[in-house]
């Protein structure tokens, strides 16, 4: 059974362990260095001040996480955000990422977010298919925009309308932990 809950800064060590192989072995993330546990803890706290940061647990072990972040740092973008998901390597395609995204989207809809974006390195076809399954469509490709492991990488931007925009938009509501209760699957 998978339990999805709001992350805490104390989860940082487990999340760094999940993230580390993506940093060291892939161009899925453009970070060159694995963040420290303290840095990752800070990122969790910073995200939770405005957006959801969720973890998935199976048998008490954290096996994945997903979070939303600011799309751009201008007020007009308050109703749009970037979403990210990571699942422990070796157990992808088990429904963990899907469960995390379902909960993430539920939380973001309550916040009045209208548009979701996902930034995906070209060649990460598994992520493209995953996002398309959730209704995302490719809206842009930035050629040779990131450099990692001795080569240039293209980046795809995918977008999904989470809800129909209103005019004027409903007020954006920052994420409080009370929006999310543990959900079992």
Residue ranges and their predicted role:
Residues 2, 61-65, 153:
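Glycine-rich phosphate/pyrophosphate-binding loop shared by adenosine-nucleotide-utilizing enzymes
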Residues 3-17:
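A short beta-loop-alpha structural element at the N-terminal edge
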Residues 16-43:
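Conserved GNAT-fold acetyl-CoA-binding loop/helix
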Residues 35-90, 101-102, 161-163:
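Acetyl-CoA-dependent GNAT
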Residues 67, 117-120, 137-154, 163-164, ...:
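Conserved catalytic-core motifs of GNAT/GCN5-like acyltransferases
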Residues 93-106, 129-133:
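Conserved acetyl-CoA-binding loop-helix of GNAT-fold acetyltransferases
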Residues 108-120:
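Conserved GNAT acetyl-CoA-binding A-motif
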Residues 118-128:
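Conserved beta-strand-loop-alpha-helix junction that forms the acyl-donor binding cleft
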């Amino acid at each position: 059974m998978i339990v999805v809950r709001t992350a805490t800064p104390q989860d940082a060590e487990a999340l760094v362990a999940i993230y580390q192989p993506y940093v060291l072995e892939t161009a899925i993330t453009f970070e060159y260095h694995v963040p420290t546990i303290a840095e990752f803890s800070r990122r969790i706290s910073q995200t939770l001040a405005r957006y959801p940061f969720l973890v998935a647990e199976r048998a008490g072990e954290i096996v994945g996480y997903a979070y939303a972040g600011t799309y751009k740092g201008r007020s007009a973008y308050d109703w749009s955000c970037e979403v990210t998901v990571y699942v422990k390597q070796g157990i992808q395609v088990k429904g963990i990422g899907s469960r995390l995204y379902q909960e993430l989207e539920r939380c973001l809809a309550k916040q009045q977010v209208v548009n979701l974006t996902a930034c995906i390195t070209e060649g990460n076809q598994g992520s493209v298919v995953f996002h398309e399954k959730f209704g995302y469509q490719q809206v842009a490709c930035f050629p040779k925009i990131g450099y990692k492991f001795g080569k240039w990488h293209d980046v795809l931007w995918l977008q999904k309308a989470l809800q129909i925009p209103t005019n004027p938009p409903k007020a954006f509501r920052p994420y409080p932990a009370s929006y999310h209760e543990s959900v079992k699957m």
